[in-house]
């Protein structure tokens, strides 16, 4: 009570913070008349002026008011849109590296142009991150007009771009991209052998659109680049056949944690079935020999009992495609790891793709924390404010709406079962359609959306279905969901990022209806007619109550529910929202106080009857908070474990970068040899031991295996002053001499390339193996809890020990490879001489090598060059200042294609 009274008197901390920004907005507004007075050239010249001021020592905060005013005026001139004051407030929040929570329809896309322009002036680049390719393209094209007018470049990263296009987009002042593309490009860059092949540039400033979706909903899913392993498809199929024969008594499942385990009876049943199928070694399922079979049984059991088609995945074109549980979108290209995807493929009878081994991985949590400054925008972030601060150190600031929200949020309505609920929903929708009110229906799965569709068909209600099966038409369906009497069924995706305008989207209508009509007076008249029709329809829809958002059940997260509500009532429009629930809903069935609900429902409700209660709504909200807390703990645990790998990833990627950028790695190779020699001697001659206790035979064996040396160690042991330091010194000298001999067999540039290649390939191989080991460790370390140990602490200790062992193995393997490298020089096969033009004869003196032929017209030399086989270009091209490879994309550190043996940058690339 007292907190509420204090808030009403003094305002919340959010209100006070927003009010402090209003002073900056007043300064921005003061610049507006001056900006309006400038002609186009003058306004465009502001960019050069700002950059000069930054170069002179001013900060971005110093020029913010004038820069924001410049962008506002540029938007008016290019888009016909003027930033509201609340968008200016949001722009300041984003510039400060915070999260702007802004209601749907308030103009987040336009708001982002303010901090984008300001921060791009530094020349270090700005990334705007969106949830899908459509929004990335749309926003880059739409807002690119503002940036282009002010002299800044805009790029967009979407799938199927080649590396040149990606590099060009990343080098733009402002780059729009999806979170997946950014993450995978980062991982791919850190698998390349040449800096010139990389596409990313250093991180600077990122703005994440729909920040809650990317940094929270997708935080549990790591991005993984993987390579294929052995094909085990036959084993998956046979295990699937075994698991299909199990009954409910054979397993216990926990839907809250999405886990399933065999009972004692189930284990015995599985053992009998596996033995009959010839898949069991011995008689005990849990013998060490059956470890792999146990894993396959567990994954098949999970696939069959816990994963549902049209809810967790769909089968499209003979492939199992994952459905995002939060957005309802297909996640093409994503696969469940650890053999689960293959188990689902076996269940559905489609082709089983080989298992993959992780080559590189990162979570979005750790990827986005690499930005020195990161901000975000969304319509729903307040419920997750604590998580945003704990993990990303980002504050959530709620931006006031430009106009008051006029939407009415009605109490939830409860039914006994799903048939009663869907019947009531269908009748409600029919009534809304009859009065011309558009309805957006939110469902949690494809299965539920198609079930509701069948109910609507029985009621004779015309409607559109938007789910993962039809996502290609998502934007257009959602854009027209505000038309009079329109009924749109959507999974949770609900077209985030696409505004639902009352009366429909006039631009889409013009595009669809007039696509074949050429420009001219007739088209102008048709466009005017459509705009008038849309305006009239908008008023009719407002009179009917605005957009009605009807949800068929509550989601695990209140934030997802709020997102759905937020589709209605944009920019002060009227609207209505309501949730319809029943005991069959997953949230109530799995997390709700089921006994109490069931007793009350069965006692007080007749079939088809509904009940609405604030107490029930409060109970649902309590269940949601429990689920949110559990999911937060899971995400926090993901971060804790991934932080361990992230620290190691930084070290490895930093070392890769240093190797790639170094002109020579001789010092690194010498240090690795020295450490390897020291390790060999230390293992054979432990500190404090006597010579007769040393493992001399083991030392000889390792010296031969790793250093490729056969020194007289037995003779050395007979010397008077024998000690480990003597072995280290002599072996080191011999190993260095061997390496020098190898290097002398080729030219210096070639040897540098060989050393780099050995280092990078060895590093990558061991890092890949290390990732697999960490994955395996993570799967089993939780069992340490039974020994009263903290799994995360155990994981940290073991991961560190594994990392040290990996570094030691890298040093040893690099040293071994260099010691055993062998060169085979082959004479090139003679090339047939080209037929020369009749008018030209040449004579090369066999002793001097001089050309004694007569002078020829320089133009004819090009004819000769054209007749030569590919890549055999006359050497005099360099002298003449010509580079025949200029049009080709060749790395400067790659061998020159002319066959000289030198790097491109020292040969034709130097021209």
Curated annotation (Swiss-Prot):
Q: Which family does it belong to?
A: Belongs to the SecA family.
- Name the gene that codes for it: secA
Query: Reaction(s) catalyzed by this protein?
Result: ATP + H2O + cellular proteinSide 1 = ADP + phosphate + cellular proteinSide 2
GO terms (molecular function) for this protein are: ATP binding; metal ion binding; protein-exporting ATPase activity
Q: Name the membrane topology term.
A: Peripheral membrane protein
Reported EC number(s) for this entry are 7.4.2.8
Q: How is the cofactor bound?
A: May bind 1 zinc ion per subunit.
Localization, UniProt: Cell inner membrane; Cytoplasm
Assembly: Monomer and homodimer. Part of the essential Sec protein translocation apparatus which comprises SecA, SecYEG and auxiliary proteins SecDF-YajC and YidC.
Could you identify this protein by its name?
A: Protein translocase subunit SecA
Q: Which Pfam families match?
A: P-loop_SecA, SEC-C, SecA_DEAD, SecA_PP_bind, SecA_SW
